[in-house]
């Protein structure tokens, strides 16, 4: 009888110990989390209020994007949120990319002065966007790529300020495919709505490979630059390709914003490969969503969308449940990553890479 009791006790402790290595849905709210890629562009604070409820800190990234608020308006929103929620809201600055005088000392001085003003409010990074490489051209009509020598003074200035660059350079590889061949519906719907960015329709533009080569060359030119590649570094389609860059560039990390569905798609094909990747590169991955408060007129709708997105992602990383996605057909299993890996992805890496003063 005593032997049976001892065996039962040991077995129970073993199961409990195994379970304690992983988070569950019950741990979602108590665990501190950071969404390292959001866009706070409204003054109603619905997004921030939901973040507090879900125990999230936020990094809002300003973007030189003609379809959104101006760089100045975004900066004002970011600083207001940062001041209202000290130690909980952080921002990445940017600058307006004006091609007038491009390639001259005057251009770089003007860009640096603008950027210096924008980071003075306490920016934790500088965001560079896909207009570099996909929109901006010099006076001869040639596309300006991120490794252009004329950008070197700006890059050097950012390094001198000990700030990382958060770079959305290029697009997902799906961008260069027909809509019918894209792997996830979030891409096909986006590029259907934004044909100006659907490179399959614009073969005269730089190729996908051109974008990746230019980004890689930037990192080769500036080995001391801390670089966080947005959207899995535009290598979302293959964790093996991303691993090659993380091996080559020790000062490179990536956020997952708007690309977790690509990890899930790969999980549906080879879960072990994706899980092994996340564990091996656990110090280089930052959780992010690319969520915004553009629909801030409806508090309930916005709050529900944010909460459900965050919770669904948490389940994918922490559980081994069978799941489906509305972005592709088929089933996949959650990665059930160990607690220490989840903590790094969800908070510790963002704190370290962005040097956050969390309160």
Regions found by a protein language model. Give the residues of each.
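Basic/polar N-terminal segments that are highly enriched at the extreme N-terminus
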Residues: 1, 16-27, 358-359
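Bacterial N-terminal signal peptides
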Residues: 5-16
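Active-site gating/metal-coordination segments in enzymes
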Residues: 18-20, 24-26, 75-198, 203, ...
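An N-terminally biased module of ancient metal coordination in phosphate/nucleic-acid-related enzymes
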Residues: 19-88, 109
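Hydrophobic faces of well-ordered beta-strands that scaffold small-molecule active sites
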Residues: 34-38, 58-61, 89-94, 126-128, ...
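Acidic-and-aromatic substrate-binding clefts and catalytic sites of carbohydrate-active enzymes
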Residues: 37-45, 64-74, 98-109, 136, ...
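Generic structural signal for hydrophobic
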Residues: 50-51, 118, 158, 218, ...
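H/E-rich (His + Asp/Glu) clusters that bind or coordinate divalent metals
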Residues: 203, 207-217, 222, 226-359
